[in-house]
Amino acid sequence: MKNFFDLFSLPTDFSIDLDTLEKKYFEFQKKFHPDKYGDKSDEIEQSIAINEAYEVLSNPLKRAAHILRLNGLDVENDVVAPKVDQATLLEVFEMRESGDLSAKDLSQKIKSLLEEVSKNLGNKNFASAAQILIRAKYFEKTLQDLKVKKWH
């Protein structure tokens, strides 16, 4: 498995400097842009890897999942990933039922959960970080569903 942090010469840490990431991304884009190399497959593969790495590292949920995967926990694989706990399901259900489901509240909840994920990753408590990340992903999915519903 590729370590996307290594690709950008960043420490494998949840808290990264997003400005540095973006700056390095644009430098790589200039250097490895497919238009510069035509059919050279190595450069095209490098460009694809850079885009994938940037997408993962620039998104805190995907970044946390990547760190966990590097440490042997795959929260993206439905077969082996921890499941959303009953308390989270009940909390979201109650929010929906009461009409208290707002994008602002969900965003704040996700932010709070990601702070917990960051702490647990920093302490190398990967199992707890994975469980909290699953919760954060569930709230993120609920937030996306809410946004879609508002547009329809």
Could you say what each language-model-derived stretch is?
Residues 1-152:
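C-terminal accessory/regulatory regions appended to core domains
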